[in-house]
A protein has these predicted regions:
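Hydrophobic positions on the alpha1 helix immediately C-terminal to the Walker A/P-loop
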Residues: 69, 73
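DNA transaction DNA-binding modules
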Residues: 249-351
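Conserved inter-motif catalytic segment of the P-loop NTP-binding fold
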Residues: 26, 33, 42, 46-47, ...
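Short, small/acidic-rich helices and loops at N termini and domain boundaries
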Residues: 1-24
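Detector for small/aliphatic-rich hydrophobic stretches
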Residues: 17-38
Length: 351
């Protein structure tokens, strides 16, 4: 439940911690100072600037082309092939195509990608519901395929149990929150395919079938929509906690059954270069794959005019940038001699 690092705790501190935990009225909270002193696991992109680890909704009207879109991104991620102008990080993909059969999937994939072998894309047409052990099935799959990046559930309704309160905010929020907990614990992306409702709204995301509880619990959502059902042109709107809001203009290639990018409505804002991170990348690289030392030693090594504490806090906050932009893992641990900083180059996957 909590992210307390027991390796960093002294015996007296640990005793006090467990005494507090035994108090039924104890409320666990962090001070702002403690928050800055933590290093959190990086949020890794599956498709950079578009899709990250976490739980997302992918919503559209029936037969608008959602399943073709799911097959397309599943293929690209499993093969490590960039999609449009977006960089893809390769990994195993599990696609629960619960409204399809294997014969239809075979025809669809062959039409889209031709005669192409792919041992990193797995497809299933049946699964348990969430209350009947789906999470255990997914955990088992990840155990067999630890490089799993993406799990697609097509559709969300297929894994929900039918009940009288199925359209309540509480039940909508609960099912997505449970799936989000799973994705966070396993550092994977869950993409939940869902339908829109017929009623229109000024906010396109309010057309998601069900209550606002679905979007409220999710890390983000994608909405695929057409002005005319017979038109090959569509827009894809994206919102989320870890990526910028976007609108992409797409066109469906009817011959190959794939979605093609026509244009993006706006250019994505990028973070400016960070001089401290740049300096770290100069001492940790393919020639020098590891650096271990104290924060004081690191200040000297980098030639910086800041305190060791300020440096480690800056690195704590930017651990995800080090990981995703510079391919460097970062640890900040307590030892008997004080705080120890460790940088390591992450080995790049070879084909």
């Amino acid at each position: 439940m909590f992210d307390k690092n027991f390796d960093d705790m002294q015996s007296e501190e640990m005793r006090e911690y467990f005494m507090q935990m035994n108090n039924p009225y104890y409320l666990y909270a962090k001070s702002m100072t403690d928050l800055y002193d933590e290093v959190y696991k990086p949020k890794t992109p599956v498709i950079e600037n578009l899709l990250y680890s976490g739980t997302y909704l992918f919503v559209g009207a029936p037969k608008v082309g959602k399943s073709f879109f799911m097959a397309q991104i599943a293929y690209h991620i499993s093969k490590g092939v960039d999609i449009w102008d977006y960089k893809v990080n390769k990994g195993t993909v599990l696609y629960l195509a619960l409204e399809d059969d294997y014969a239809r999937l075979q025809r669809r994939l062959y039409t889209m990608f031709g005669e192409c072998e792919n041992d990193n894309l797995y497809l299933a047409t049946q699964s348990h519901q969430l209350n009947d052990g789906l999470d255990k099935q997914l955990e088992y799959f990840i155990g067999k395929h630890p490089d799993t990046k993406l799990i697609i559930i097509d559709t969300l309704q297929k894994i929900r149990e039918i009940s009288g309160d199925k359209f309540s905010y509480a039940s909508d929020y609960d099912i997505v929150a449970r799936l989000k907990k799973f994705s966070d614990n396993n550092n994977v992306c869950l993409l939940l395919v869902h339908h829109t409702r017929k009623q229109q709204s000024d906010d396109c995301f309010e057309t998601i079938s069900g209550t606002n509880g679905l979007l409220g619990a999710a890390d983000g959502a994608f909405l695929l929509q057409k002005e005319k059902r017979t038109s090959p042109k569509a827009t894809l709107d994206a919102v989320g906690r870890d990526q910028q809001d976007q609108r992409l203009y797409l066109e469906f290639n009817r011959e190959r059954c794939i979605w093609e990018l026509i244009k993006a409505e706006n250019e994505l804002w990028t973070l400016p270069d960070d001089p401290i991170l740049e300096n770290v990348s100069n001492i940790v690289n393919n020639e020098n794959t590891e650096w271990i030392g104290t924060a004081t030693e690191l200040v000297t090594e980098l030639g910086l005019d800041i305190s060791p504490n300020s440096l480690t806090r800056h690195l704590n906050v930017n651990a995800d940038r080090l990981f995703n932009e510079y391919n460097i893992s970062y640890e900040n641990t307590r030892t008997h001699a004080g705080r120890q900083v460790t940088f390591k180059i992450i080995p790049k996957e070879t084909e």
